[in-house]
C-alpha cells in the first residue's frame, strides 16, 4: 500500500495522526510532498519532496509513473520527454494569455453573493477544490461546485438570467459532458463564463497529450484570477478566520 500526502506546513495534526496510525498498523509506504523544508510529515515519509506550490503537478507526475510501471500508460516516456522540455514554459504562456481575461473576471465577480462552478473529468477535482479551498477558504466567498453530468439533475432549475456560473471544459473523454452544459447555459443565463483549455496553446505538446494537461491549464488560468480577486476584494488569501486560530 502506498499513501501520498501533500501539506503546506507539514504539521497538520489530523494528517500527522493519520500517517502515524497508517505506518504503525498497516505499514504503508508514505510519499510526502511538503512545502516546508523541515516538518513532521517529512520525517514520517519514506520518500519526501520539499518544494512549494504546484501540488497538482506533483500528484499527477507520481500517478502517471505508477500507471506506467503497471503497464497502463504506453506513451509515458515520449509524453514526459515533451513535458520535461516544453510544459513549464507552456504554462507560463497560458498565464500570460489569461491575464486580461482574469482582470475582467475578477472585476465582474469579486462581490458575487454566490458563484457556481461546473466541471467534469480530470477537471472535476480541480473544480471542487477551487470552489472550496480558494473561493470559500481563502477569499470567503460563497460557492457551489457541481459535476457537469449532475448539472441537469436539479441545479439548472435555480439558474436565472443573473446567476454567476463558471464552466470548465477539458479535453479528456468527459469533455462532451461539459460541452453540453456550455451549449445549454446561454438559453437561461447571461452571467456565465466558459473556461476551455482548448483555447490555450501548449507549444511543443502533441495534441494527443493535451488531455492529460487540461487541469494544469485550468490551474494556470485560476492563478491569474486569484491575483486579481485579491486586488478587487482587498482580501489577502493568506488570512483565515478560524483555521489555526481556534481549536476544533
Model-derived regions: residue spans:
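Active-site phosphate/pyrophosphate-binding segments
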Residues: 48-51, 55, 67-147, 152, ...
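Short, ordered loop/turn segments at secondary-structure junctions
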Residues: 35-37, 148, 197-200
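Phosphate-moiety recognition in structured ligand-binding domains
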Residues: 45, 181-248
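Short, surface-exposed amphipathic charged segments that create phosphate/polyanion-binding patches used
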Residues: 2, 62-66, 159-161, 205-214
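Glycine-rich phosphate-binding loops that contact phosphosugars or nucleotide phosphates
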Residues: 1-87, 168-193
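Short, well-ordered alpha-helix to beta-strand connector turns
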Residues: 44-46, 112-113, 161-163, 189
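Short glycine-rich or small-residue beta-strand-to-loop segments that form or flank ligand, phosphate
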Residues: 2-7, 114-121, 164-168
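Internal helical hairpin/lid segments
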Residues: 125-193
Amino acid at each position: 500500500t502506498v499513501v501520498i500526502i501533500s501539506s503546506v506546513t507539514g504539521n497538520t495534526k489530523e494528517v500527522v495522526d493519520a500517517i502515524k496510525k497508517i505506518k504503525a498498523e498497516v505499514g504503508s509506504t508514505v510519499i510526502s510532498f511538503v512545502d516546508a523544508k523541515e516538518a513532521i510529515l517529512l520525517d514520517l515519509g519514506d520518500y519526501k519532496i520539499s518544494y512549494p506550490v504546484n501540488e497538482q503537478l506533483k500528484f499527477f507526475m507520481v500517478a502517471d509513473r505508477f500507471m506506467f510501471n503497471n503497464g497502463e500508460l504506453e506513451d509515458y516516456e515520449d509524453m514526459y520527454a515533451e513535458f520535461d522540455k516544453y510544459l513549464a514554459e507552456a504554462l507560463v504562456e497560458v498565464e500570460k494569455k489569461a491575464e486580461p481575461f482574469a482582470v475582467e473576471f475578477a472585476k465582474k465577480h469579486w462581490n458575487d453573493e454566490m458563484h457556481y462552478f461546473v466541471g467534469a473529468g480530470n477537471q472535476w477535482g480541480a473544480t471542487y477544490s477551487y470552489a472550496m479551498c480558494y473561493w470559500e477558504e481563502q477569499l470567503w466567498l460563497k460557492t457551489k461546485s457541481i459535476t457537469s453530468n449532475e448539472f441537469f439533475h436539479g441545479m439548472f432549475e435555480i439558474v436565472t438570467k443573473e446567476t454567476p456560473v463558471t464552466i470548465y471544459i477539458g479535453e479528456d473523454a468527459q469533455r462532451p459532458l461539459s460541452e453540453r452544459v456550455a451549449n445549454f447555459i446561454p438559453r437561461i443565463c447571461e452571467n456565465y463564463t466558459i473556461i476551455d483549455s482548448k483555447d490555450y496553446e501548449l507549444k511543443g505538446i502533441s495534441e494527443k497529450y493535451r488531455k492529460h494537461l487540461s487541469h494544469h491549464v485550468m490551474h494556470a488560468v485560476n492563478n491569474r484570477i486569484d491575483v486579481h480577486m485579491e486586488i478587487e476584494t482587498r482580501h489577502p488569501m493568506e488570512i483565515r478566520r478560524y483555521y489555526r486560530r481556534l481549536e476544533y
